[in-house]
Regions:
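Conserved phosphate- and dinucleotide-binding cores of soluble alpha/beta proteins
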Residues: 15-19, 68-179
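N-terminal glycine-/serine-/threonine-rich phosphate-binding loop
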Residues: 6-92
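Residue-identity detector for glycine
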Residues: 1-2
């Protein structure tokens, strides 16, 4: 099952809310767990907190990163890594979101790691989304565009299909962000 870890409006800067969400999420991590390590600024706080617990206590976990950026950060934090080829499932996956609706529907993937994030989330017994008040929207897609990750060989058909559905689709190459 999934859950949403939301830190309500706090009388502090947004980075403090993100840090609070990340550190609260790490309380779910137990020794022996295999943990999906998500992507984004809020999840980065969780990865740093996991690394701190590994260094300062007897926490032993294995992480599966959802992006090149989270893999790099996990290594810097001293989190041992594995892959989904090497293990069957994850006990927990922690990840962020780009937008959250009042019904707790999400948009993810603007960082360019959508497919990896989805695969890791699907392999987790529990999927926890870390968010802060800046991600709240009344309607998904109201603030920014909806990301759709497409294989290079499918770019033409997908663009034609989206345009046929009335979307104003454009291509952004995966050379930026976290992917």
């Amino acid at each position: 099952g999934g859950s949403l870890l939301f830190i309500p409006d706090l009388p502090c800067p947004m980075n403090e809310a993100k840090k609070a969400a990340g550190e609260q999420a790490v309380e779910l991590v137990r020794t022996g767990m295999r943990v999906g390590l998500g992507t984004g600024s809020t999840t980065a706080y969780a990865l740093r907190a996991i690394g701190r617990r590994i260094r300062e206590s007897s926490l032993h976990v294995m992480g599966v990163p959802t992006s090149f950026a989270s893999e790099r950060l996990a290594r810097e934090c001293g989190i041992p890594l594995t892959t989904l080829d090497e293990i069957d499932e994850l006990d927990l996956a922690l990840d962020g979101a780009d937008e959250v609706s009042p019904d707790l529907d999400l948009i993810k993937g603007r960082g360019g790691a959508h497919t990896r994030e989805k695969v890791v989330a699907a392999q987790a017994r529990r999927f926890v989304v870390l968010t802060d008040p800046s991600k709240d929207v009344e309607r998904l897609g109201a603030k920014r565009v909806l990301p759709v990750e497409v294989l290079p060989m499918a770019t033409g058909p997908v663009l034609r299909t989206l345009t046929g559905l009335g979307a104003n689709a454009s291509l952004r190459m995966g050379r930026e962000k976290d992917g």
